[in-house]
Amino acid sequence: MESLTQYIPDEFSMLRFGKKFAEILLKLHTEKAIMVYLNGDLGAGKTTLTRGMLQGIGHQGNVKSPTYTLVEEYNIAGKMIYHFDLYRLADPEELEFMGIRDYFNTDSICLIEWSEKGQGILPEADILVNIDYYDDARNIELIAQTNLGKNIISAFSN
């Protein structure tokens, strides 16, 4: 399993890492959505990473956690980016009622926080993003789950 670990000393570095990550994802053309699972405790920096990704590729507005709305949609550079937060999800079947599978059948990017709440409904992740924090610093580990995930990690080295 290919992986990459990055030390993130502060918020600025998290935003910069997010920008690079998004630039890599935007260059990929796929038949289906690129699935990115964002893992970490409350306050670990999942939404901050997402903000860095979105603002780094041109989103001008606020980026808020979709804790209450379940999903926030962004159309940037001709690509749909969906940011899901499943923290408040009581039952994975709720995802079926909202038509979740429609989000995954296009050339889009799906960033999913608390993916374990959608177990059995969500497709396999292409890449896992594990965020651990220590005081103000973070460690981000990217773990490839598919060949596409391996390509994403390889692109970080270029």
From Swiss-Prot:
Amino-acid positions noted as binding ATP in the UniProt annotation, renumbered to this chain: E11, G43, A44, G45, K46, T47, T48, D136
Q: Which Pfam families match?
A: TsaE (PF02367)
Name its species: Haemophilus influenzae (strain ATCC 51907 / DSM 11121 / KW20 / Rd)
- Name the chain's protein: tRNA threonylcarbamoyladenosine biosynthesis protein TsaE
Any stretches that span the bilayer, and where are they?
none
A GO molecular function term, named singly, is:
ATP binding
Q: What is the lineage of its organism?
A: Bacteria, Pseudomonadati, Pseudomonadota, Gammaproteobacteria, Pasteurellales
The function of this protein is: Required for the formation of a threonylcarbamoyl group on adenosine at position 37 (t(6)A37) in tRNAs that read codons beginning with adenine. Is involved in the transfer of the threonylcarbamoyl moiety of threonylcarbamoyl-AMP (TC-AMP) to the N6 group of A37, together with TsaD and TsaB. TsaE seems to play an indirect role in the t(6)A biosynthesis pathway, possibly in regulating the core enzymatic function of TsaD. Displays ATPase activity in vitro.
- Name the NCBIfam families on file: T6A_YjeE (TIGR00150)
List the InterPro entries: P-loop_NTPase, T6A_TsaE
Binding sites annotated in the UniProt record for Mg(2+) = T47, E113
**Entry's Gene3D superfamilies?**
P-loop containing nucleotide triphosphate hydrolases
List GO BP terms, alphabetically: tRNA threonylcarbamoyladenosine modification
Keywords (alphabetical) are: ATP-binding, Cytoplasm, Magnesium, Metal-binding, Nucleotide-binding, tRNA processing
According to the UniProt record, one GO cellular component term is:
cytoplasm
Q: Give the location in the cell.
A: Cytoplasm
Matching SUPFAM superfamilies, A to Z?
P-loop containing nucleoside triphosphate hydrolases
Q: Which family does the similarity line name?
A: Belongs to the TsaE family.
